[in-house]
Amino acid sequence: MQLWVGLGNPGPKYAMHRHNVGFMAADVIAEIHDFPPPVKKFQGWLQDGRIGSTRILLLKPGTFMNESGRSVRAALDFYKLAATDVTVFYDELDLAPMKVKVKRGGGAAGHNGIRSMIQHIGDDFRRIRIGIGHPGHKDRVTGHVLGNYHKSEMEPLADLLGAIAAEAEWLAKGDDVRFQSDLALRLQG
């Protein structure tokens, strides 16, 4: 059993923010893999499904981004899972838009949702960093991160999220390298 977490802020006004791409990824994974509807649990929304032969608990914390770790900790404690069983999908400012990198461990790199997770569960969890690009100047970061995706970005974003969901079985199997390479091939073709 694994716990997959999509980071974002709750509420319709945040739904299309770049900062919510983790929520978007979780939604597409749930849709593609026929997860049942979410239930309110662990200060968030939980879906319990399978990807291949692996049971996946898919959690979208209902706390705001800065408190995401509380929701994740509650789920880990209930299911008696470790941080190593966690995969988190989130926006990465310092990665080009529509690029994806997989990483395990490390610091928060200025991301408040990741900082909260590290505070509550430690840093030994897998991260699926989804690039949103840097706006160029630090004064523009907040507006960029908390801004909606532009209309011109919607089709590439849908393609990216669909590809992440389609290749998610490799993540479930623990094959990060195959996930990354097959994702790149799918997005090229």
From Swiss-Prot:
It catalyses: an N-acyl-L-alpha-aminoacyl-tRNA + H2O = an N-acyl-L-amino acid + a tRNA + H(+). TRNA binds at residues 14, 64, 66, 112. PROSITE patterns: PEPT_TRNA_HYDROL_2 (PS01196). The active site is at 19 (proton acceptor). Its EC number is 3.1.1.29. Keywords: Cytoplasm, Hydrolase, RNA-binding, tRNA-binding. It is an enzyme of class 3 (hydrolase). Monomer. Belongs to the PTH family. PANTHER family: PEPTIDYL-TRNA HYDROLASE (PTHR17224:SF1). This is Peptidyl-tRNA hydrolase. It comes from Sphingopyxis alaskensis (strain DSM 13593 / LMG 18877 / RB2256) (Sphingomonas alaskensis). The gene is pth.
